Amino acid sequence: MRALPAFPIENPMIEVRDLSKWFRGAGGERVTAVDAVRFTVRPGEVFGLLGPNGAGKTTTLRMLCTVLTPSAGTATVADFDVVTQPGEVRRHVGFLSANTGVYDRMTAWEMVEYYGRLNQIHPDVLKPRMDELFATLQMTEFRDVRGGQLSTGMKQKLSIARALVNDPPVLIFDEPTAGLDVLVQRAVLDNVKRLRGRGKTIIFSTHIMREVEKLCDRVAVMAKGKVVVCGTLDELRTLYKQDDLEELFFALVS
């Protein structure tokens, strides 16, 4: 398959080199989930990992935020190695997945405050930062509402607030709109746009083409654990002579 030239990026915020992850199957055989993927993400860029279910997107992101340890290869986030400096990586990353838990008995404010304390943010810094977060995400009136009483959309906003409370330069979102209705999806995407305007580096996984078109500066398309191609949407359209994004997606992953 044709590929775009891999131009080096100076001082990338995220650099992934031949990153692999394998597991042991029920019979002891090695099952490869991610196979020697390579890509870089520029500071302030919105970068999409695009691919069908089972392509290796979630596993890749979980290695970048140190939830999983790579089987081979290297990756750095904000110049910190995900294997040898996991604590520093976690301090520089906010992670959000579709399954991020919300505690039913804690209020929205208490949950975000708890994560702030876990990150050892001084109380004099934490409160004004939380005030700003709740205002930005339009959550101020829900600060004293318990998690079990929040709507699905508010729970997702709460998860974003928790990911942002330590003001990380890098945000990793794994399928952030999965399972949400159209209105909530739009609200989440609007919030991602606001974060982009604040200079955050964002990498997120999706298989929804409209999310890619609205948000991404560049994408890496994954299939069967490998990166098939990486570039801007315009570059991919030109390379594969296909303007329709849905058709382009099917051509790349089939």
Residue ranges and their predicted role:
Residues E113, R117, D124-F142, D190:
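Conserved ABC ATPase "signature" region
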Residues C230-G231:
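ABC ATPase "signature
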Residues D167:
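Conserved catalytic motifs of ABC-family nucleotide-binding domains
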Residues L171-D174:
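Catalytic Walker B motif of ABC-type/P-loop ATPase nucleotide-binding domains
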Residues I9-V16, K21-A36, P43, P86:
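A short, flexible loop at the N-terminus of ABC-type nucleotide-binding domains that lies
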Residues R146-L150:
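Conserved ABC ATPase signature
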